[in-house]
Curated annotation (Swiss-Prot):
Lineage: Eukaryota, Metazoa, Ecdysozoa, Nematoda, Chromadorea
Key word Cell cycle present: no
Result, substituting Q332A: Strongly reduces catalytic activity
Activity regulation, short description: Inhibited by trehalose 6-sulfate.
Domain of life of the source: Eukaryota
EC number: 3.1.3.12
Protein name: Trehalose-phosphatase
Amino acid sequence: MTETVTDQGKQRSSKLQKNEAAKDEQVEGKGKETLESGTDKSAEQNSSLLVGQPDVIDNDNVQTVDDFKNLMYKMQETRRAIVFALLNEKDLTKDDVEILKRAYEKLTDNQTHSFQREMCTLTTKLSVNIGDETRGLEKDLKYLDALMNIRREEPNLLWPIIMSRVDLFSILANYHPKGKETFLKEYEDTVKFLKTFISSEAITGKKPIFITDWDGTMKDYCSQYATNLQPVYSAVGMTRFAASFTRISAVLTAGPLRGPGILDLTAMPIDGPVMFSGSWGREWWLSGKRVVHQDGITDEGFNALQRLDDEMKDLLHTSDYAPFALVGSGVQRKVDRLTLGVQTVCHHVTSELSNRYQMAVKERMHRVDPNSQILVFDPSTELEVEVVAHNSGIIWNKGNGVERLIKSLGDSLQSPGKILICGDTLSDIPMVRQAVKQNPDGVLAIFVGAKMSLREEVKQVIGDESRCCFVSCPDVIHAAMSQILNEHCIGK
């Protein structure tokens, strides 16, 4: 087993990972939507991405796919600036908030109906579900408006005091998929649960460890992975919670670090108290460098994947296949594979177009690997395919990612001290198992939106139902973290 440290731009890759847990996360992460009260649910469930027949079209007044992505990424840069200001006692600029308002106005103009936004490429019109992007901005604007109102009334107050006076629960409760009453019950239970987690420092003398999945756990699912962007309120709360109450906090996701990946999509400081990983913990961003665990990966496999990634960028920018950049997983360059979205949850890409796209992918694979000795085309689910580099048979899961992080940091999961693992699918169970193996009585787990079978598995692995907590959506956790921080601030 080897570990390499490289600059951000350099990448490695790895093995054929036929892992049911990983598949579980990929299937659920495709375009699953968290539906909230007050929205047109039927429209969202029946629409995701509608791709028209290729033809030369009139693009007047219709936003292009590239324009949409550029709008969202520039808006996310502004979110990061706002988060930085709030965390470092800087003034918020009116311009920054206005940028978010203008982005929201753009997303809700007459090109959008019931969260379906009409867009185009050079030859194709399409309709994209932007419900998650819109709601995230809506919640942020309410949150920032509350902060700014208090700041105007009492300009000498520090941001933590101002934040403690904002009722985040009331802002988020209306968006809970099961209503306010359920939100309140889950919120109260989660506040108590998190208090148990952070109180362990007083008993053991060590701050606890917090490790979490991302999509579906700390961030609502989005129809487009490429624009699954973290809101301000979430970024501020997670960063402050990690800094105040934990000695290690980490996000461990199946997606990549870059390209886009978690480092592009988060609004948290990437070199702050929360660390980030991609590819099931095969790649980490630590101390400003990309750390890659390349077990079983050959140089030939890495090079072939890198060349295919370049081929895919060319394919999406110079053909009728541009819409596939926004189909589910889009194009994700992971350590050992490329994950490619080929269909939406609601099957709004025609079979003919999806098949043509997959044939185009195979043709690009042949350019890179003409003898089919390095790359494997794996139609892993009906929603996505994977192009995987041949490997030495090593099976990697998120538990391995946790193990490598702790080893890299020179720390331990063993007692004394508590560990909180958060997830939402079977692919997150290996993180729980890894922690329980090292610290049987010190592991707590929060799982989001889990089916009964998954809940039972979590309880069985933990071995103590009182150390398990289940909620319906990520916002419950964010509201609970906010309350813990508010009480901590008032206590000071």
